[in-house]
Amino acid sequence: MAEKHIVTVNGSDMEVWVARPEGAGPFPALILAIHAPANVGIENDPFTLDLLDRYAAQGYVCAAPFIFHWWPKEEPMDTKRAGLRDDRLVKDMNAAFALLDGMDVVDGDRIGILGHCMGGRIAWLAACHNDRLKALVVLYGGRIKAGSGEGGPAPIDLAANIPCPVLGLFGNDDQNPSPADVDDYEAALTAAGIDYTFHRYDGTNHAFQDFSRPERYNAASSDDAWEKIRVFLARHLTPGG
C-alpha cells in the first residue's frame, strides 16, 4: 500500500506517494508520472494507486509525485492544465528522483520513469533532463510535440538528451497521440540515435490501460502491454534481467 511523503519544490509542498516491495532491498525504483484524472488527488485515483501497488509487487519502489500541488485539489482541471509549465514539471520529477535516490531501500543506479497519457509526455520530458535514468516507458503520451507554458522547448525537440532505452505503447485509434504523431516520435528518436521499441495496437484507443474508464479500457491490449513493460523493466533495471 502506498504511503504519502512530502517534499518541497519551489516553496510548495508536493505529495509523493510511494509503494515499496517487502524486504530490505536495495530495490530498483520507478517514478510514475501521473495521468490527468489524478489531478483530484492520487489518493482519489484508483488507477494510479493500482499502478503503485502493481510495480511494488514486481519488486520496484514506485513513487508518484502529485504535479498539481500548485492548486487546490478541487480546482477545475482546465485551470490546472492551463497553468502547467515544463520547467516546473521537470523540478517535480527531479524532486521525486531525489526522494527515491535518498532512500536506503533504493538502488539509485537503477531508477526508471514511466507514465500514461499526459504522464507519458511528462516522463519523456523528465528523461531529457536527468541523465541518471535507466529506462523510459511512454504509454499513449500526447502533446510531446508541444511545449507547456513558457517552460522550454517541446519534449520531442529534446529527444537527443534521453539517456536510456525507451519503450512506447500506443493505440492506433487514438488521436492524441495520433498514429502520425507516433510516426514523428519514432523519427525523432531514430534521428537522435536512441534505443527504442514501439508497439501499436489496432482497435485500441487512448487510455487503453485505464480500467476505471470502461469506454476506453481494452483488456487484450492492456495485458499485452503489461507483459512488454515487465520484460523491458526487468531487462534494464534488474541485474541479469
Language model: regions and residue ranges:
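Primarily recognizes the serine-hydrolase "nucleophile elbow" in alpha/beta-hydrolase
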Residues: 95-161
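A short beta-to-alpha transition loop/helix N-cap that caps and shapes the active-site region
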Residues: 40-41, 71-74, 143-149, 176
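Serine-hydrolase catalytic machinery in alpha/beta-hydrolase-like enzymes
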Residues: 5-105, 208-210
